[in-house]
Regions:
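Alpha-helical membrane insertion/targeting regions
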Residues: 2-233
Length: 233
């Protein structure tokens, strides 16, 4: 009897711990994202060439990118609320569509910025790889949901949102580099751009595998006990 209660309580505790953990993660991401949006959009809120520097002649592409990106950063967390899709499926779908439109707008702005950028090839190619990864993860997520595969859709949209946050991750990595008094050369900047989405994806994949193992492992003792109980009687 005690083992049966323990077998039931353990998964409940695991789910509760998982929900609390994800809540902390999303709250932290929300705080960092809001700070990033206020800082970046505040910087370019005044039409001043000294604030825009090299983006002054390309401010149209810049604002296209920032406007679409702001939509995705703000709407992204709403899509991952546990009860949101079940309670408001139509609203969830429309919010997702607006998110996708925002992503396409941001990618259009990014394409214009990359095409007109005087930056070295390694930096432009790193930006292009980020945009391509962003679009690819969204496409795979869309294919999954059109096939009725909800779990893969959710996982791929999580990956997509981690790429959405790559500018914020890049900013954190760049500040860490400056704090270490290391010179931000073009090659270093390109490496940070790649790491800004590769590192979060690697961390997510590792955490996803660990959670899967934890979900499976409690079932093994129960199955073993079920198999051995007839013999013991």
């Amino acid at each position: 009897m005690g083992h049966a209660i323990q077998d039931v309580v353990s998964p409940i505790r695991m789910r509760l711990a998982q929900r609390i953990g994800w809540a902390i993660v999303w709250l932290a991401l929300a705080a960092i994202s809001i700070n990033f949006l206020l800082t970046v959009h505040g910087k370019y809120s005044h039409l001043d060439p000294s604030a825009y520097t090299m983006f002054w002649s390309r401010r149209g592409w810049l604002w296209t990118h920032l406007g679409g990106g702001a939509l995705t950063v703000v709407l992204g967390p709403l899509q991952f609320l546990t009860r949101w899709p079940r309670a408001f499926p139509r609203l969830h779908r429309w919010t997702g569509r607006i998110y996708m439109v925002g992503m396409l707008i941001a990618c259009a702005g990014a394409t214009g910025l990359i095409a007109t950028s005087p930056a070295p090839f390694e930096i432009r190619s790193a930006f292009a790889a980020t945009a391509l990864t962003w679009l690819t993860t969204a496409l795979v997520a869309l294919i999954a949901i059109h096939r009725g595969r909800v779990a893969p859709h959710r996982n791929w949209m999580t990956r997509n949102y981690l790429v959405t946050l790559s500018p914020i991750t890049f900013r954190i990595l760049l500040q860490a580099l400056i704090a270490l008094e290391l010179p931000p050369s073009p090659t270093t900047i390109a490496i940070l751009l790649w790491l800004s989405w590769l590192l979060p994806l690697l961390v997510y994949e590792g955490a996803y595998r660990i959670v899967d193992l934890l979900r499976v492992s409690p079932a093994h003792p129960a199955r073993m006990g079920a198999r051995s109980s007839p013999a013991s009687t």
